[in-house]
Amino acid sequence: MLAGRDFLSNLDMTSAELRAVMDTAHSMKAGEWRAVKPLSGLSLALVFEKASLRTRTTFDVGMYQLGGHAITLSNTEIGLGTRERVSDVARNLERWVDGVMGRVYLQQTLVELAQHARIPVINGLSDMLHPAQLLADYQTIEEEFGQDLRGKRVVYIGDGNNLANSHIHMGILTGTDVTVVTPVGYEPNAGVLMDAVKAGVEVHLTNDLDAIQGADVLYTDVWISMGQEAEADIRRRAFRGYQVTPEMLETISPDGIFLHCLPAHYGEETVPEATEHPKSRVFDQAENRLHAQKALLYHVLGDMKPRW
């Protein structure tokens, strides 16, 4: 299974492995693991190039609840690729801790960490992908629609960014029908789209807002990600009209739900009335970061024993 392996992309799992993680996440949320400490004596380094609320809190609390320990390292302390080579950071951390979670600017940084560390590396966010977030997203979706999600319409509206890319990967694994609604020039990564082609999975790309109608899941994310501030005005103009509002939520399936990974830039990709709408599951989704990532940590680190 996933024991001892890197998790840089949702496609680092098989569908069966994803099912095992999801089942564990649901049982953890139900309180069935409250007295179990499978990661006792293990440590996880949390490496941050980007600011974080949900990623830092949930991985830290998750390790604690499973009996392990997390240590947070900011980029001002480490200087990935500046103060020290990424490979040297990896070869140091592997001597002290049992795994690394990285929330970084570039996917290549995680690839380098994984290449040089003999311990598992987990993607907590990169410019390319956000796979840990998608575990929480799909836990939330399963809470609404059950385990068999084949044919459910997941419509992502906004920037074809790391979230859109990871939604495509999850569509490959789960059989959801993924549509990305985005302005011309802001489509998902070409390599990720090729992953779908190779898997024989059709991804629907459009700039037609009518594609939202009847969606089972409507998902959005910020128009301006960290590091894109210089493009803010251009992006706001490009995405005008792509804002999720309560009126838009009335056009999705009657049983449909609205998700946003947060933080929300209110007045841009959505408004407070949407995240507070009866169809919103945004804060359930945020809670599930804890349960889904605990499940991931258990499956990746759970077979390890303390070295000292």
Swiss-Prot record:
GO terms for biological process: arginine biosynthetic process via ornithine; citrulline biosynthetic process; L-arginine biosynthetic process. It is found in: Cytoplasm. SUPFAM superfamilies: Aspartate/ornithine carbamoyltransferase. It catalyses: carbamoyl phosphate + L-ornithine = L-citrulline + phosphate + H(+). Keywords: Amino-acid biosynthesis, Arginine biosynthesis, Cytoplasm, Transferase. GO terms for molecular function: amino acid binding; ornithine carbamoyltransferase activity. L-ornithine binds at N162, D221, S225, M226. It holds the Pfam family OTCace. Carbamoyl phosphate binds at R103, H130, P131, A132, Q133, C261, L262, R289. It comes from the Bacteria. Reversibly catalyzes the transfer of the carbamoyl group from carbamoyl phosphate (CP) to the N(epsilon) atom of ornithine (ORN) to produce L-citrulline. This is Ornithine carbamoyltransferase.
